[in-house]
Design a protein with these regions (language model features):
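Metal-coordinating catalytic core of metallo-dependent amide/deamination hydrolases
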Residues: 1-85
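Distinct, well-ordered alpha-helical segments
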Residues: 2-4, 86-95, 134-139, 163-164
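Glycine-enriched alpha-helix->loop->beta-strand junction motifs that scaffold or abut catalytic
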Residues: 7-11, 91-99, 114-120, 145-148
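General beta-strand structural signal in soluble alpha/beta enzymes
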Residues: 13-15, 78-82, 100-102, 121, ...
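Active-site environment of divalent metal-dependent phosphoester hydrolases
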Residues: 20-21, 84-89, 106-109, 127, ...
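A general structural motif
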Residues: 58-61, 80-82, 99-109, 128-135
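Short beta-strand/loop segments at the ligand-binding rim of alpha/beta enzyme cores
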Residues: 71-79, 95-96, 118, 122
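His/Asp/Glu-enriched, well-ordered alpha-helical/loop segment
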Residues: 115-125, 129-182
């Protein structure tokens, strides 16, 4: 990762951890239900997957700090992902992260903005009307003024559709809705 950061070919580094029990899947029951929606797994399989993911090797504090230092040195933007606590925001703020991707609650989105971070939600979340993992509703967050940007996430066409959904179903001014995606 460091060599890519130093190559000049990277514009953004996002520190992501999808380990069940924190972030997007703080609630292990939600993780299990989501997993069962994608795969034919038993409760025992879910427990095994949770254990394996929780025990898997992750970047250490020192490694994250070192990568963030290289990113800052190279002018690469730093993002945090699935922010779920003030402690995580404080840690990421200390790394000079300027983006909070997919804060999991309205309180965390507001706290990220209070720290000067740009907040991002997924346009598919706007289309669905809710998070697929039971977290922050992008519609609610946009209406509360807690989201700065909508991204395509896993469905690029959702960007344009989200603009009209925000206008038609949330009463957001069309220019403000377009500003979220452009």
């Amino acid at each position: 990762i460091e060599s890519f950061l130093r190559s000049g070919k990277v514009d953004l580094v996002s520190f992501m951890d999808h380990t069940p029990g924190q972030g997007q899947y703080r609630d292990l029951l939600v993780f299990g239900d989501t997993l069962k929606g994608y795969r034919d797994v038993s409760d025992e399989d879910v427990r095994d997957i949770v254990r394996q993911q929780q025990e898997s090797q992750k970047l250490t504090y020192a490694q994250i700090t070192a990568l963030a230092a290289v990113a800052r040195e190279r002018g690469v933007s730093i993002a945090s992902h699935d922010d779920d606590s003030e402690d995580k925001l404080a840690f990421m703020d200390g790394l000079e992260a300027t983006i909070s991707e997919f804060p999991i609650s309205l309180d965390i989105a507001r706290a990220a903005r209070a720290r000067g971070m740009h907040t991002i939600a997924g346009a598919p979340n706007v289309m669905l009307g809710h998070s697929h993992s039971g977290n922050l509703s992008a519609r609610e967050a946009v209406q509360a003024g807690a989201i700065d940007v909508l991204c395509s996430d896993y469905y690029p066409a959702a960007l344009l559709d989200a603009v009209f959904t925000l206008r038609d179903q949330c009463g957001l001014d069309i220019a403000k809705a377009f500003a979220l995606v452009t």
